[in-house]
Amino acid sequence: MASQTAVAARGAYRQILRATRVAFQNDFRVLIAARQEARQQFDKHRREGIDTPMQINHAKEVADILRHNIVQGVRDGSDEASKWELRIHDDIERGDNDSIKIGGKNVKIEKACSA
């Protein structure tokens, strides 16, 4: 039977794979590169150590960022003046930009970005 840490690590790895599928849909070159990097990082830390829970947490945070904060764009034409089309999917985090409207005033941040 696998240890809890191994199960958590496999779960985090699966989260990264799912997040790369969502973030890099139809961009196979970047999708393959992201998955290879994830695999290399997990293989590098294959043995369980003191920092394993932190590494698992880091992997989950990476998956969350990939899923909610990465937007890809494709240029409509081949010239520099052509417009970019952004692929914004349902999981993308959308802000309201209220802090931009405040201007030069001090902005109080209620919570951390990762909260």
Swiss-Prot record:
Q: Which GO terms describe its biological process?
A: mitochondrial respiratory chain complex III assembly
Enumerate the subcellular locations listed in this protein's record, separating them with semicolons.
Mitochondrion matrix
Q: Which residues form a coiled coil?
A: none
Keyword field contains Mitochondrion: yes
**InterPro entries annotated for this entry?**
Complex1_LYR_dom, Complex1_LYR_LYRM7, MZM1/LYRM7
For whether the record's keyword set contains Cytoplasm, the answer is no
UniProt-listed Pfam families: Complex1_LYR
Quote the transit peptide annotation as a residue range: 1-36
Primary residence:
mitochondrion
Sorted alphabetically, which keywords does the UniProt record give?
Chaperone, Mitochondrion, Transit peptide
Q: Which CDD domains match?
A: Complex1_LYR_LYRM7
- A Gene Ontology MF term for this entry? protein folding chaperone
* Entry's Gene Ontology cellular component terms: mitochondrial matrix
What's the subunit arrangement here?
A: Interacts with RIP1.
Query: What role is this protein assigned?
Result: Assembly factor required for Rieske Fe-S protein RIP1 incorporation into the cytochrome b-c1 (CIII) complex. Functions as a chaperone, binding to this subunit within the mitochondrial matrix and stabilizing it prior to its translocation and insertion into the late CIII dimeric intermediate within the mitochondrial inner membrane. Modulates the mitochondrial matrix zinc pool.
Q: Which family is this protein grouped under?
A: Belongs to the complex I LYR family. MZM1 subfamily.
Record-given protein name? Mitochondrial zinc maintenance protein 1, mitochondrial
Record the organism: Aspergillus clavatus (strain ATCC 1007 / CBS 513.65 / DSM 816 / NCTC 3887 / NRRL 1 / QM 1276 / 107)
